[in-house]
């Protein structure tokens, strides 16, 4: 008899939980979704640094667009040192992801994996208290650093034909504290 009562209690608990979840979902459908708005790209362009000595920089690019029901802001700048296929290059991009917190959570959670092989490495890093992820492909000499700033800005630095240690020099050129205050 005790076991039957226990089964009924469990069924009641599961049923109550299901009804509660369904009621919450129905109630939530009637609530407006409050999504913070992304900043205008013009506020982020000044964060992109000038070219270091002996380098040239392309004109910064940026946009704020409506994409599938939410807005997205992105800025980007390319840097070159010399000419030709083997010349060192760098690119810096900033994406305002405040309108998509699920994307932020999923992406930064994936940064917890570290690996090293004969082909390169990937590792989680912390830059001035900001979580990040660094990857390097030896054969192509392609290095990338992603940093999440203020839980909203994805900062990406890509280097081609450079030592991956140069990522640390490039990140110093970006004012992360100033970026964190832009809203």
List PLM regions with ranges.
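A short, solvent-exposed beta-edge/loop patch
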Residues: 29-34, 81, 115-183
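Bacterial N-terminal signal peptides
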Residues: 13-23
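Broad gene-expression machinery/nucleic-acid interaction feature
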Residues: 14, 74-76, 89, 144, ...
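Bacterial N-terminal signal peptides that target proteins for export
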Residues: 2-14
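Sec/Tat signal peptide C-region and signal peptidase I cleavage site
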Residues: 24-28
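Short, solvent-exposed recognition patches
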Residues: 31-140
């Amino acid at each position: 008899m005790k076991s039957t009562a226990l089964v009924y209690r469990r069924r009641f608990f599961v049923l109550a939980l299901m009804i509660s979840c369904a009621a919450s979902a129905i109630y939530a459908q009637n609530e407006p979704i409050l999504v913070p708005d992304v900043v205008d790209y013009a506020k982020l362009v000044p964060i992109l640094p000038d070219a270091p000595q002996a380098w040239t920089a392309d004109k910064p690019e940026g946009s704020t667009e409506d994409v599938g029901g939410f807005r997205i802001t992105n800025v980007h700048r390319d840097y070159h040192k010399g000419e030709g296929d083997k010349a060192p290059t760098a690119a810096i991009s900033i994406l305002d992801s405040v309108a998509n917190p699920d994307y932020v959570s999923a992406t930064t959670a994936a940064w917890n994996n570290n690996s090293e092989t004969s082909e390169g490495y990937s590792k989680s890093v912390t830059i001035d208290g900001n979580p990040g992820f660094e990857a390097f492909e030896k054969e192509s000499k392609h290095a990338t650093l992603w940093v999440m700033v203020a839980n909203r800005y994805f900062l990406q630095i890509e280097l081609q034909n450079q030592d991956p240690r140069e990522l640390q020099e490039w990140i110093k050129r970006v004012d992360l504290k100033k970026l964190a205050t832009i809203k």
